[in-house]
Amino acid sequence: MTTQNLVIRPIRSEDIASVQDFLLKQLRDLFHQEGQVAITDDVWGLGKTYLEPENCNMWAVFTPAGTVVGSAAICAYNDRIELLKGRYHLPATAEVGRCYIDAGLRRQGIGSKLVGLMTDFCRQHGYKMLYLHTHHFLPGGFNFWQKQGFEIILDQGGSFEIVHMEKRL
């Protein structure tokens, strides 16, 4: 499949079921290591989490047939990570999440386009800092975020291989 025919746009309420299906498949495929369970609260509440708040958004990548092959989301960071409590000025910090690309389409610039859209959105909504966490075991995840200008603030290591990263806008 060529990337030139793909459409990247903010999701709408009618996209929720297909985006949920895509995300749940990605989570099953990527978080299958023993003892790991992906957190899916936001997946089941996409509308409430990413569509209703004006300072949040989610984008999806669609094939011409309407199949979801990628996603990325921005929401206001809520100081939920215990190890980082108090680090961020909350009104000015956004959290990047749910950035996944179908395995057959990775390394073709789609993720970078999504990051560009998220960055533009964040600047328009007054965010000054982007926070995310990733895992060393995710294919291309950690290296991708470093190439996008994110810096490590905490590498937890351990079986979940969690790395916390940030980027100042």
Outline where the language-model segments fall.
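Loop/helix-junction capping segments adjacent to catalytic residues or to phosphate/diphosphate-binding pockets
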Residues: A17, Q108, P139
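Extreme N-terminal starter segment of soluble prokaryotic enzymes
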Residues: N5-V7
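Active-site acidic-Proline motif in GNAT/NAT acetyltransferases
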Residues: D102-G104, Q108, H136
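Acetyl-CoA-dependent GNAT
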Residues: P10-I16, D21-G97, D102, V115-L117, ...
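Conserved phosphate-binding and hydrolysis motifs of nucleotide-dependent enzymes
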Residues: G70, G109-G111, G149
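C-terminal "cap" of GNAT-fold acetyltransferases
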Residues: T3, K25-D29, Y88-A92, K128-Y131, ...
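Conserved amphipathic alpha-helical interaction elements at protein-protein interfaces in regulatory
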Residues: D29, R107, D120-Q124, E151
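Conserved acyl-CoA
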Residues: D102, K113-M129
